[in-house]
Structure formats: C-alpha cells, structure tokens
Amino acid sequence: MSASQLPHPPRPSQTKIVATLGPASSEPGQIAELIVAGVDVFRLNMAHGNRDEHGVRLAAIRQASDELGQPVAVLTDLAGPKIRLGELPGGELTCDSGAAIRFVRTSPLPPHAPVEGRDGGEPKAERPTELTTTYEPLIDELAVGDRVMLADGTVALTVEEVGKDYARCTVVQPGLIRSRQGVNLPGVKLSAPALGAADLDNAVWAAQSGVDFVGLSFVRTPEEIRRLKSLLRSHGSEAQVIAKIEKPEALDRLGEIVEATDGVMVARGDLGVEIDIARVAVVQKEIIAACNRCRKPVIIATQMLDSMQHSRIPTRAEVTDVANAILDGADACMLSGETAIGEYPRQAVEMMHRIALATEPLCRRRPPLPEPDLDAAGVNQITEATVYAAGRIAEKLDARLVVVASASGATALSLAKNRNYVPTVGVSDSPSTLRRMCLYWGVIPLSGAPTGDSEVLLDYITTWGRNAGLLESGDRIVLIAGTGLAVTAHNMVVVHELA
C-alpha cells in the first residue's frame, strides 16, 4: 500500500492500551471498533474459553488489523498454576465468621481438563462445607497456621488441622464464595511449576498461531522464563515473553526476572492477595522502575477501570490510578473484565485513551527515567547513545516527527524508554517487529514503508505525513536507522527538512 492510501493518522496517545477479549468483545465488528477506539494489544486469556474460541478471535484481530491498515499485537496469557475452587453445591457458599470449612483431596485433572468458563470438568464437593480445588497436592502442601484466601482475598481462612485427605480451616474473614473462584496461599511455596502440561500445550498453540507476546503467570524464577523462550523458539516463534509478577518469590528475584524476560506485567489481582494489599502501590512503583532501568516494557493490570464493567463512567479513584501508572513510567495499561465481559467495552477503551491524553503532558515535567543498566537491558551502547542524541536533536530542532527504522525493534524500544516526546513512527520490513512495536510507549508502527533506502523512506514518510495532516513545508523529520536494517544504515541519524 502506498503512503497516499493510508487514511488513518496516528493516535496521539503515547501510553499503549491492552484489552482482554471475551464474550462482550469477540465479534469482528466489535474488535475493529476497539482498534479504532485505541487498542494496541489484544489479550487472549487462556484461563477462560478454549483454543478454538481464541483461534477465532485471533483470526478476527488479524483481519481487522489488515482492513484498517493498522498493526495490532496479540498477547496470549497462559493460565499458569492458578488454583481454583471446584464446583460448590448450589454454585455458592456463604462463609460465616468462625465457621469450619474442610478442603478435601481430589483426583488430579487431566492436562486438557476444562477450566473456568467451560462446562464440567471441575472436581465437585459432596457436602456444603467441603471444598475441592483444581490443585491435587493442596492437602500435602498446607500446614497448620497457613492462611487461605478465596475469591480475590475477600474471604480468608486459617488452617487448623491437616489430615491425610483433608485440611480443616476456620473462617476468619467472612463472605460469599462461588464455584471456580480463585484460591491463594500467601507464604506457601507450592510445588506446581509455572508451566504445567496445559500451559505447555497452549504455548505451542500460541507459537504455531503466530501470536506476538506470551504471558507467563505466577513467575518465580528466571529459569522459568528461559524455558518458555526456548519452547517458543523451538517451534519457530518470535513471540516475546511477558513475565507476570504475582508472587513474593518473584519480588525476591525481581532484578533477575526483569533481565531474563522481554516485558513485565504487574498483575495486581493475585499480587494483592499474595502480599499485603497495603504494599501494592509501592511494589508497583518498584517494578516499573526496575523495568525502565532494564529497558523492558511494563504493563499495569487489574481493576484499572473496573467499575466500567457496569458503568459508563469510572470512579475518580480509577482515573487517578491510571494517571499515576502513566506518571510512574508504565508503557501500557490493561483492561480485563472491562472489555472481556463488561457492558461498555468500547467506552472503557475510549476512557483509558482520554486519561492518557490528559496525563501525558505532565510527564514532560517529571524527572527523566533512570539511566539504563545496559548490561541487564542487553542494549547496544552505540544504539543507546544514537537514540539519546536523536531525541535531543528532535527536541532542539522542534521536529514534527521522529522516524525509527528497526529490523528487530530494539532501536524503537530504546527510543521509547528514553521518553522522546516528539511523535515517533516505527517502520520495519518485518510484520512481527511492527506488531511488537504496538507495546512500545510512544511508538506508532507504520506498515508498508520501504526500509531499504533512507531517501525513499523519507519520501514515503513525507507523503504519508502530509496526507495525515501531520507535516507541511518547513517541518523537520529526524530519522534513526537501527542496527541490522541495512549495511548503509547502521546507527545513523538524518535530519530532513520538508521543501
């Protein structure tokens, strides 16, 4: 497609938006609507639905992206060793303070057993005050005094006795629980690996389906990340790994995990149950800072606009939460139930976009992000210096656009992490690289641009920019040619002034 045929000007939001697909947002028209509203990355949550359903969604995403001429990335989120309650008699149970509740041993489920959102397959309790779970070794790994948190921490139990096939608990924080809700064991080190049999199968499916990012849930060690990367590469996938920080063990090895991964998600739901909820905001800031030092994209997730599942307008606290995540240096904010099962998915995306637009001007007045740890980030020193200089040149010359040409996307990511506030366009001859740029702060991926010759590329960008109303005579463009693009275009900066 020629530059003159590209009708869609870049969105001004520099913060990227990740949206989870589900029953409320899976029709092709709905997906296209969400892209237009501002979605950069779609999340397929493997804890809900099945691969056939996700395959249909993936095809619809790719089709909408092609029709709109706009790259969009896909993140497949592996369920990981999430423990869930089995089926409860009647579907729910009121847990009164001081009541006795027993967990009873269940048989292990096969690797392809249905998970939440599918019919059947969950272990069933026989008595009202007995609970089963999807985690067969639970009884063996509990000890007297352990805390058990149910339903995102709204109900709390204390283990009083552990027998051969049961664990007797007392309710210390009452509330209502339902079938298939989550179970958290703060402080208990579980034997379950981050990649179980079902996760390995789903990772292979993700690799073969050509997704762009794979989320690894409940990460505890960098070795788990390297194992997933190796599996993806063995199936010919270029997908990058997003480590989800949800466990105290991950915080203990945060530096190693950030260094090993390609990106990070601050998964505040389980994290806020596994650690003291009062610490979540501080820990979020620490994780963002670690990612920025290592030049890794970081996504903030869970309950960002949660009330918009049922309301057209978010709470003031939610708006402030999104804004503060942006001010802290997050690259992306994520919507979960808001777009997957909510009543107003498009409005939720539009609201997040509006909050980003209102907040980003203040980012310019904030202290710069920390100096990178180049060894940990794996960033070439020449690339980092070139990108830094190009950003300063663009600001000094009041350039209208920065164009970064990058074969792998590394130069574009480095530019994003330098927080250059001049609108930035990323180009590459690799469609997968362009899609990965969808997660990079402030980088607008532009498909179809000729990358082999700098002069031809500048002509293309000039035509495109004029048609989009972004450029006029006398404006300046700064071009950065990234490492590996072409022999004559390694780490160079070109300033072009429109005639």
Regions found by a protein language model. Give the residues of each.
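Non-catalytic helical/linker scaffolds that mediate oligomerization, partner binding
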Residues: 1-499
